[in-house]
Amino acid sequence: MPDTATVQIPAAGTYQLDPQASSISFATRHMFGLAGVHGTFRLISGQITITDPVTSSTASAVIDAASFQSGGGARDKDVKSANFLHAGEHPQITFTSTQLVRDGDRWLLRGQITVRGNSAPADLVITEARTDEDGLFIKATTRIDRYAHQLTKKKGMAGRYLDMEITARATRS
């Protein structure tokens, strides 16, 4: 992650996230930290509202819990099962911002992530934000503690933390 983010404050307005042009990826460890796991989730929908002042801006996103993919068929099935995400009963993972703050040289989008009905705070570090003729482009990173969401099965075998990278494209509505 760069030491300084490239952040261009977009024009005030409401922007709809484009699921087809956005991506959510993660990296974690398993097998007692010996091996890495990389994968993705699929964005269903989301909205960003830029205000003046920008610190009052808001964002929300809905992620498809059943879209978890890591390239390991048995692992993917297990993560989607009642052992972890229980995607059949809790099909959505949601993020709702609570505030946008300047933290030194970077911007943090503070909010709540809800997984399997359990909410926990999360800070999304905005590493890039820019506008172009197609709308708004944002990159952000965050670290999710699965234990904070009561996803505590298979300690040691499945990593506790997921390092997430969100790349989002949004169009002004």
Write out the residue ranges for each language-model feature.
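Low-complexity, acidic/polar, glycine-enriched regions of mature
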Residues: 1-173
